[in-house]
């Protein structure tokens, strides 16, 4: 943690705080920010969560009326100033809670399809920290340079969605694994770190793990791991994520 006290917004070292305060042009104030996850390099969209929470807090304190979608849009625009390779999915995924499919359409329209959480009656979902944090810019730049390799993922997303609509959980988890293999094939930067490759192989070979993938851009952060309920047996600490239609809750195991 780091404490800053400045007379001018431009002198603030915390880039996220500086960008948001500069946008609103607020008078002097005290800002205290805490997090239960790494604020950078976790692959959990923590930067977007920070920005959205900060914008929401400022709007409430200053009686600025903003819809959730307006907050997501502003968060995306401000985050672009920090990372030109950031995507829509982080702010729009964090800013609107729940288990959902998001469609980003031409013209800027964003559509949400909120999904049944029946999957989680049978399967547990865990986060497993790799011990590796990274700046996502380099990974995302490498992915951007190989966009033609990303396109097959779009079809896989639709197939996974169709599986959920048919309440075919096993098929959905099959496509989750398939999407991870497709993601790795886009660029070697996704699994460049040796620790990531070792853990990936260990999870793939573990009989209690039904599906897994690395969250976020790749090459660090957390693995998302699925197992039968109360049946995960891996040599790593994990956090079980309880999913409801309204959002998620984490429980350390």
Model-flagged regions — what are they?
Residues 1-25, 58-65, 73-84, 91-214, ...:
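C-terminal nucleotide
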Residues 13-17, 46, 50, 54, ...:
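Generic hydrophobic, aliphatic-rich segments that mediate packing or membrane embedding
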Residues 23-42, 70, 74:
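Glycine- and acidic-rich phosphate- and metal-coordinating loops
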Residues 41-51, 87-100, 217-220:
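FAD-binding core of FAD-dependent oxidoreductases
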Residues 43-66:
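DPxDG-like acidic metal-binding loop motif
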């Amino acid at each position: 943690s780091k404490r800053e006290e400045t007379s001018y917004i431009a002198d603030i070292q915390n880039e996220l705080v500086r960008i948001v305060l500069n946008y609103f042009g607020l008078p002097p104030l005290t800002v205290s920010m805490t997090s239960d996850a790494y604020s950078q390099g976790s692959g959990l969209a923590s930067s977007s969560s920070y920005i959205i929470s900060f914008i929401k807090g400022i709007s409430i304190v200053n009686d600025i009326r903003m819809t959730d979608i307006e907050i997501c849009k502003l968060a995306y625009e401000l985050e672009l100033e920090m990372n030109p390779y950031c995507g829509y999915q982080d702010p729009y995924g964090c800013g609107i809670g729940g288990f959902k499919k998001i469609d980003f359409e031409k013209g800027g329209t964003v559509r949400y399809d909120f999904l049944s959480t029946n999957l989680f009656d049978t399967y547990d979902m865990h986060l497993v920290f790799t011990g590796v944090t990274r700046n996502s810019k380099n990974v995302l730049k490498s992915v951007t340079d190989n966009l033609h390799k990303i396109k097959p993922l779009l079809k896989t997303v639709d197939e996974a969605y169709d599986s959920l609509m048919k309440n075919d959980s096993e098929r959905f988890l099959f496509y989750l694994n398939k999407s991870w293999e497709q993601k790795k094939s886009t660029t070697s930067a996704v699994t460049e770190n040796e620790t990531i490759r070792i853990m990936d192989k260990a999870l793939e070979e573990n009989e209690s793990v039904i599906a897994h993938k690395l969250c976020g851009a790749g090459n660090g952060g957390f693995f998302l791991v699925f197992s039968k309920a109360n049946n995960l047996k891996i040599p790593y600490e994990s956090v079980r994520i309880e999913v409801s239609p309204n959002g998620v809750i984490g429980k350390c195991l």
